[in-house]
Amino acid sequence: MSNSPNPWIDMRPGIRRKTITTGATMYQMVAELKAGSHLPEHHHEQEQISHVLSGRLVMITGGARHEVAAGESFYLASNVPHAVDTIEDAVVLDTFSPPRTDYLAVDAAAKSA
């Protein structure tokens, strides 16, 4: 999917991500999610905008389920708990602010391995 020199990182079974670029205040990645995969509830300090490039998934926030399909986007404020259920294979472009330094550290370790 991405021509980025960064490695693909397996996040969970059926979910992997790849850093596209980062800057002083923003970070962008692409995620591939297989149908039936699940990202458990979590939260992070970063604001997040996700744009579904292909496929369909369900974003779960505050107990509510929101289906999001190719061509649609969603916004998550800082520290909002959320989870994801993947309905069909999906590719998602995620942008975070500030950058995901935790993801960048994993990228650096993978490159040096």
Regions found by a protein language model. Give the residues of each.
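Structural motif
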Residues: 56-58, 65, 81, 91
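Glycine- and acidic-residue-biased ligand/ion/polar-headgroup-sensing regions
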Residues: 46-57, 62
